[in-house]
Regions:
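N-terminal glycine-rich dinucleotide-binding loop that anchors FAD/FMN and/or NAD(P) in oxidoreductases
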Residues: 26-51
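Short beta-strand to alpha-helix junction loop
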Residues: 44-47, 65-84, 133-137, 165-168, ...
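Glycine-rich loop(s) and the adjacent beta-strand/alpha-helix scaffold that form part
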Residues: 123-169
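Residues at the starts of beta-strands that form the adenosine-phosphate
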Residues: 14, 92, 152
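Residue-level recognition of phosphate/Mg2+-coordinating polar/acidic sites
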Residues: 23, 48-66, 112, 123-127, ...
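A conserved short coil-to-beta-strand element within the FAD-binding core of flavoproteins
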Residues: 95-109
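Short loop/edge segments at beta-strand edges and connector loops
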Residues: 93-97, 113, 155-157, 298
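Glycine-rich FAD pyrophosphate-binding loop
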Residues: 7-32
Length: 302
């Protein structure tokens, strides 16, 4: 896409793409579970993005959640459209050409390819992706090269990932609950999402967890442990019930010790009963504000 845009802006430019892998768009071909989630109607400037893809011949459809996919729901079609556009514009692609390093001279850039080739260019555009999913070729090469050329690089952390927790909740592994989840930093609300949370052996996962994970930012120079401890994740298992304590009080008259039955999954029910004892107010608080402490983001490969 970067090469196509550059060529469209300057039709006389001679452009070559150095592709690390032997095939084009391997990571793009795997996005959206192979369907290629191009954009979302909730994203800013999504219409501009769609116009770009329309210009490449990609017709899209939007699902009920606002996610935008190619009508074929095949990410490889998007890859093919990009390759065809490069062919049409006369953009050369050199495959299996991982860049080892780049040197900046007065007149140009000297780009060294691992297998021994060297290319000189007056301009260099680094569009090497991030660091997530190394099996698709993205291992942080772009930031490494940019840093070698004098650019400042902020700390790289995974985003849109599951969250590891300080609390030991392995006994809840496999439990899924639709709920409202919120991220807090030193008592300040940062982000709120609604969706399904999945408890795992290490912490929590699910799309709503991925969405809040990108807001967990540890500043440069701050140790990760102390940085994570400033955040809290709160889960409201019953966001549709405002007066939960009153509801539980009424249920306790009819159901006695079984007043939590049918509200959440059994494993979670047993845990809340164990921690709250017969204190209905405490049980209500746990259901409305189940508070957790992140200790890490899951990582680049998850």
């Amino acid at each position: 896409m970067a090469a196509i845009t550059a060529k469209q802006k300057n039709k006389d430019a001679k452009i070559i793409v150095l592709e690390k892998l032997g095939v084009p768009g391997k990571k793009l071909g795997a996005t959206g579970n192979g369907k290629c989630n191009i954009s979302n109607i909730k994203c800013e400037h999504h219409e501009a993005v769609l116009n770009v893809f329309k210009g490449l011949g990609i017709i899209t459809r939007t699902d009920k959640a606002g996610r935008i996919y190619p009508c074929s729901e095949d990410a490889k079609d998007v890859v093919r459209a990009l390759v065809l556009s490069m062919d049409r514009l006369g953009i050369r692609v050199k495959y299996s050409s991982p860049v080892s390093h780049v040197e900046k001279n007065k007149e140009d850039f000297e780009i060294y390819i691992e297998k021994g080739d060297r290319i000189k260019s007056k301009s260099l555009l680094i569009a090497a992706g991030g660091k997530a999913g190394s099996k698709f070729g993205t291992t942080g090469d772009g930031t490494r090269i940019a840093k070698s050329l004098g650019h400042s690089i902020t700390r790289l952390v995974p985003s849109l990932t599951a969250v590891e927790l300080k609390e030991e909740l392995g006994f809840l592994a496999g439990v899924r609950e639709k709920c409202e989840i919120s991220l807090w930093y030193e008592e300040k609300l940062i982000r709120k999402e609604y969706g399904e949370v999945q408890f795992t052996g290490y912490g929590i996962s699910g799309i709503c967890v991925f969405n809040i994970s990108k807001y967990i930012v540890i500043p440069e120079g701050v140790p990760l442990k102390s940085g994570f401890e400033k955040y809290r994740i709160k889960i409201d298992f019953l966001p549709e019930i405002d007066n939960l304590e009153e509801v539980l009080e009424n249920r306790s008259f009819k159901l006695q010790d079984n007043y939590l039955i049918s509200l959440v999954k059994r494993a979670l029910t047993e845990y809340i009963k164990e921690k709250s004892g017969k204190d209905i107010s405490k049980a209500a608080k746990m259901l409305k504000s189940f508070t957790l402490t992140p200790k890490n983001l899951r990582g680049w490969e998850f």
